[in-house]
Design a protein with these regions (language model features):
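Active-site acidic carboxylates
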Residues: 1-83
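A short glycine-/small-residue-rich loop at the edge of a beta-strand within enzyme catalytic domains
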Residues: 59, 84, 88, 107
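Glycine-rich oxoanion-binding loops at beta->alpha junctions
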Residues: 79-101
Length: 109
């Protein structure tokens, strides 16, 4: 049975929405992704859902795209650097998951 998400028991994870990865997508699609991630972040903030973000090898792939990166910063969202494909292999990310202990994770990216 499907259950309604409880914001305080959920986690929003923004995964690898970065400059060089975005450049590989059609501009109109990336603009749509950026807009939708922005709406998701606003909803998370209004509803009190915790948020985390990852960046895959930011030296090579660049930072999180604007305005998403700026919004994450304004919200005080931790960003975890990773070089492995899986975010859950990053110890800091795993620690945050354990702290929040979400019943659901909403993934964007």
């Amino acid at each position: 049975m499907l259950k309604r998400l409880v914001p305080s028991k959920s986690l929003v994870a923004v995964i690898d929405v970065q400059d060089r990865l975005a450049a590989a997508m059609p501009k109109e699609k990336m603009a749509d992704v950026a807009r939708k991630v922005g709406v998701l972040l606003e909803a998370a903030e209004l509803l009190g859902a915790p948020v985390v973000a990852t960046e895959q090898y930011s030296k090579g792939l660049g930072p999180t795209i604007e305005p998403i990166g700026r919004r994450l910063h304004e919200m005080g969202v931790p960003r975890f650097e990773k070089t492995a494909f899986s975010a859950v292999d990053v110890p800091e990310f795993q620690k945050r998951l354990e702290e929040v202990a979400p019943s659901a994770i909403v993934v964007a990216g």
